[in-house]
Amino acid sequence: MLQERKLILITRKTRLQELKEKYCTLGQAKFYIEHLGERFDNYVAEDALYVEAQKTVLTHLKESGRVQLLERSMLSTYLFANDDIIVVLGQDGLVANTLKYLKGQPLIAINPIPDLYDGVLLPFCVSDTLEALNNVLRSRMSVKRISMAQVTTNLGDSMLAVNDVFIGPKTHTSARYKICVGEATEQQSSSGVIVSTGLGSTGWFKSILAGASGIAQRPLHKQLSNGFAWDSADLYYSVREP
């Protein structure tokens, strides 16, 4: 059944497609991969599975309405309408990257290759596409909301972060910081500070805590061992390198 809301399918180039663009021919790409000691047929198989998943999802979406196919590199320049429905053919990184350009539009995250990708942010398979879309259209969907961090520099530039914000020199050399949160102030010196959201709390933040726990020989805080809520208003600050 056709409906008026536009369906935006977000995709990304496969590793094989990126290699073909970089080295111009499959032969050159194969030589490079095998020179690294990797199996080139893994790249070919992954590409075939992703392309097939994209065709299937696109077919399902076209049965329901107008579809706009959008590659990841175009995200920063695309203007989403308020009533657009976003469908991401993941990995997790593509979902996170897409979220920061949205303003409350529903996002359906699909895992194109469940046997290959660990989809923490990908609750749906390709076969779930129509059911998930129909639930959104009928407002019957189960929604998981997230909170993002907004960063503003002293020059007035602003950006949104879905997982983490890294504050520090590009060279990762040590620098001094004065951190002020409310009335609390702390002076420190490190190669950077990581500010994590709830969505990022099971990724980089968790690795940081595990490393700190190993160095200090102390167990992780129980409240943070499994991360914190995706929609939490809290932000956690971590020193990248003491």
How would you label these PLM feature ranges?
Residues 93, 112-115:
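Short, acidic/turn-prone active-site loops that include or flank metal/cofactor-
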Residues 84-85:
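Structural motif
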Residues 94-99, 202-205:
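Short glycine/serine/threonine-rich phosphate/pyrophosphate-binding segments
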Residues 199:
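Conserved binding/recognition cores within well-folded domains
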Residues 98-112:
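A short, gly/pro- and small-residue-rich
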Residues 72-80:
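A short, basic/flexible loop-to-alpha-helix module at the beginning of a structural domain
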Residues 2-7, 11-13, 18, 30, ...:
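Catalytic phosphate-donor-binding core of small-molecule kinases
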Residues 88-92:
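N-terminal glycine-rich "phosphate-gripper" loop used for MgATP/nucleotide binding
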